[in-house]
Amino acid sequence: MQSDDRSVREGSDSSQTFLMKMAQPTGELTHPSQQQQQQLLQQQSFRSIFGGASDTAEEIDTETDSNHRRPHSFGAAATTPAKLANKNVAPFLVKHIPEQYGPLGSRRTDKLEDLSSPNSKFCYRHRPDLKCRRQADEPSMDKLQRELETLPPSDQQGIAHVWSLFSAAPAKHRKLILQGIMAQCCFPQLSFVSATVRDLIRIDFLTALPPEISFKILCYLDTTSLCKAAQVSSRWRALADDDVVWHRMCEQHIHRKCKKCGWGLPLLERKRLRESKREIELRATTWDVSGPAQNAGGAECSAPHADDVITQKRKADSSDDETAIVKRHCSSLDARPEPDEDYYTTRYRPWKEVYKDRFKVGTNWKYGRCSTKVFKGHTNGVMCLQFEDNILATGSYDATIKIWDTETGEELRTLRGHQSGIRCLQFDDTKLISGSMDRSLKVWNWRTGECISTYTGHRGGVIGLHFDATILASASVDKTVKIWNFEDKSTFLLRGHTDWVNAVRVDTTSRTVFSASDDCTVRLWDLDTKACLRTFHGHVGQVQQVVPLPREFEFEDHDAECDNDNMSTTSGDTESNSLQATLGLESNATETSVFGPSFDNGRPAPPRYIVTSALDSTIRLWETTTGRCLRTFFGHLEGVWALGADTLRIVSGAEDRMVKIWDPRTGKCERTFTGHSGPVTCIGLGDSRFATGSEDCEVRMYSFRN
């Protein structure tokens, strides 16, 4: 209890020692009348603040009047004010600050009694054990000191006594003193108090709060406010620039539309984004109060390098001078690894730098700022393409596949082997699969140009293919979809379309396949039961493309336009439309059950939204669970041959030689690109660029990175 009492008493302002010295008799007032007048003035001031017995006040007033009439009298009345001052002021100071003001032997030993008194409670700003206690402002105290020194010594002593009394008073007495002073202030003085208090009551709440709460507050700010917060102080900058805050910002905006601000940033590998979330949350609770921990959380606490779709890895590249300067080492800067170990050490960028990079790309997409590169080499129309990192693969009616370096524009190699025009292709890190009008599919080592194997089975030309993991689906002129299983070497056909099947998309998560056909329909197939789960009707022209949207895509139902479109219908082999309308979408179980009994046991549902294009010059956005057409995109003058989509935009190419970029949520055409002299037949879409192929034998790549 003694130590607690000592800590409470030490909670007074750091300038109290100076004030106490000023409160002691100065010794400079040697003339009795001057000393008497000063003490009388002090006593009058104190009693006007604290109040007192009326007889004492009358005695002081009488003596004051007597002194005014007899300024040089040194009678017994001259000693009375000094005694009264000592009687009323000194005991007050001794009671509340005995360590600094009380004479020897007069200090109280009963600490328990002092602490039990309600007057011993200090307000939170003067408790030394509280973090948010306001410290003395050194510049203000220096200014106060200089102004005080300009006054006569008698005035200095009187003012110092008032300060000493207030500094020594507990919370209850302080309020009374302030109320009395405020009651006597005029309007200019009250205005001065208001202006002064406005600044004094401000506290650094981010420093006072625990780090995890400070991060929670900062996560509610937008990017502009965060940057302004970082300019407040070094402490605020450490908090506002921390990975905890900017990881949340990336998670909220990258590859999706933010519901608050409407902004969405280009694609980032969301798997890595989700994997690092737990480490970021742990980092927030273990943040060092003296500043952010160096490389806390290791590799998982940093963002993957968002350079391109699918293969964005935030590994340092010596050729990337622009980003290398902001990358940081994951290991300690003091412990330098061996040269070989340093060579293989992964480097990372702060999440703020990742957001900054994505924001620049997103702004370029919004305003159409891009650079264009043209690839020429094919002797006939380009019908298919795909790009990853700096590799571009194109297939043409000249029966060749060309591999390009997107950075230099150089043709790396040409793959020859098909006997007719190539209508579709897809590649990954190890292989490239192509489909041709010669009814075959070929598997290539695109790095060497070697044809590894050839698959036949269709009775017509192969005009569409898509593989995911171990499943390959091919679409053919023979009106069928063929499924190839690389794992068990099995194959089977999906029959149901009545005309050419132009495009297929495999979803291995739900084990389903989408197909688009010249019979103006889109079908959803179950790979386990080989049954058609859903048929989408609505297009009045041959459907050329179908693209499932990522599962992160969100669409507000109130934005739907085609709810009452009688021409947009759906049919299923196991359910009726009325049953689909009756079943809600309130849970995942309900969402999967609309596709049949095979989805009742927790099997993942197919992608909820798909986008299709047709030769009726329109693009449609569908909801797979109900079969509704949510939105129709109008703008192309002729049939839409090519389509690409992600969570932020839809890119389409048509017979009218134009490429259009759409907002999938509003249906608005954001930008139109021209340049091809023939119909646009294929499109590849990435996070910061897209490529188009045309019957004019050219491929054009638009980059929004620079």
UniProtKB/Swiss-Prot annotation:
CDD domains per UniProt: F-box_SpPof1-like, WD40
Pathway the protein takes part in: Protein modification; protein ubiquitination
Any Pfam family matching the protein: WD40
Gene3D superfamilies membership: 1.20.1280.50, YVTN repeat-like/Quinoprotein amine dehydrogenase
Assigned keywords, A-Z: Repeat, Transcription, Transcription regulation, Ubl conjugation pathway, WD repeat
Compositionally biased residues, Low complexity: 34-43
Domain F-box residue range list: 203-249
Region (Disordered): 1-43, 56-76
Skewed-composition ranges (Basic and acidic residues): 1-12
WD repeat intervals: 377-414, 417-456, 458-494, 496-537, 589-632, 635-672, 675-706
Subunit structure: Component of the SCF(sconB) E3 ubiquitin ligase complex.
Biological role: Component of the SCF(sconB) E3 ubiquitin ligase complex involved in the regulation of sulfur metabolite repression, probably by mediating the inactivation or degradation of the metR transcription factor.
Family: Belongs to the WD repeat MET30/SCONB/SCON-2 family.
Family matches, as PANTHER family: UBIQUITIN LIGASE SPECIFICITY FACTOR/HREP PROTEIN, UBIQUITIN-BINDING SDF UBIQUITIN LIGASE COMPLEX SUBUNIT
Name of the protein this chain belongs to: Probable E3 ubiquitin ligase complex SCF subunit sconB
Annotated organism of origin: Aspergillus flavus (strain ATCC 200026 / FGSC A1120 / IAM 13836 / NRRL 3357 / JCM 12722 / SRRC 167)
Primary gene name: sconB
